[in-house]
């Protein structure tokens, strides 16, 4: 399998896991890594939270050795605090520091962070320069096609980030106003790839091997990134890798495999967050895993009531009995 470099970091050219707040935590990342994700990015980390010593923020920075190559993603609107936070991230030894300039969530945008920075290119460039100046590793920037369909500026923005010292960029082919609706415009990613000399990661609507191959071919990007397409499907990374290598689809996972993965994932969440908090957070993951099963609406509602790991085991037994007719 081919590889490419972000700075001095070698990454296999299969598929990366996108940074997703409150989703791509350590347990989620480890599951995706086990199934072949070639590059992982953390949940977004508040630059000011890090600078002001917030313990919850600091916990987001903790890396397991098996997660590498790995990026910690910072967000913020103030170049000074972004630079200071990048310096603090050095103690966690990330392979890469990524800057979030693409998050569409109103709370983040309202503070001038995330995709709001696409409307403030000078501030965005200053942030990138400050992070590059303070980081001991390559710096990348993730952004969108633009703010809305009338202000598509990803190409100019990518050039600006390259000039500011970014070692790679990630472009999500949707605008901020689209959020996650409609289709991602892969042509924008292609244009970005043609405009800069640094590597370009493409993001948006990659959900399987066929769509991954199509994005590589249509955009010329150096790596594809999968976000929502991995919900309840960490094996999507294995599927992508196999398809890219052979041109063949792997068989659908069996119900037994799916339940075994869900069980392992929830056990990992509880390992890192404790059973009480872990099972609260596991509920949404379980709801994704049971999608498409017999009586999935009822099962998803049942997931919302999972309080203990024993509740989970009991639900899995019922699902297997129902699906397999035992």
Label the model's feature ranges:
Residues 1-326:
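Flavin-dependent oxidoreductase catalytic cores
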